[in-house]
Amino acid sequence: RIRVFTHSDVSVDAVLASACLPFLFQAVEIDGEFFWDGGYMGNPPLYPLIYHCDSRDVLIVQLNPIRIPELPKTAQAILDRVNTLSFNSSLMREMRAIHFVTKLIDNGFDDDGRLKRMLLHTVDAEDVLSRLGVSSKLNADWDFLTTLFNLGRERAEAFLVQHFDKV
């Protein structure tokens, strides 16, 4: 089951659990329950923002590519694609839920004002990230991390230039 840690629930253990990949680390115990990376079930948990956030705008920083042009042919490439699909599936599910709520609102149902229209914005580097293998997620080389950091800055600046007035 998904647990979204909020406010006072956010602790060092909650952050460790959120980053805990099950094939690399053991689950983290919090209040007698065990948790590991939410990427498999709720990454990111957008739907709670409908009820618990004053802002209508949500900015998604897309780390996993959605479209990868190459067809995987080797066992490792297929396993990598399964990994990417697994992590993207929860985001796609959350986005479908937001779209569903938008349709409800468009049809006049807002659950007595509890539902709100969400505006999703995305910053991505899919053209670059789609060429990196899944193993790059474990690459802690400083030069590689600096390259990703700089790429993120470039894409964020480009997003702001193009879309600042829409946020």
Predicted regions and their residues:
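A short acidic-Thr-Gly-centered motif at the start of a beta-strand
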Residues: 23-32
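Carboxylate- and glycine-rich phosphate/diphosphate-binding segment that chelates Mg2+/Mn2+
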Residues: 1-6, 24
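Non-catalytic peripheral regions of patatin-like phospholipases
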Residues: 5-10, 33, 39-167
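Active-site glycine-rich loop that binds ribose-phosphate moieties when present
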Residues: 12-24, 38-44
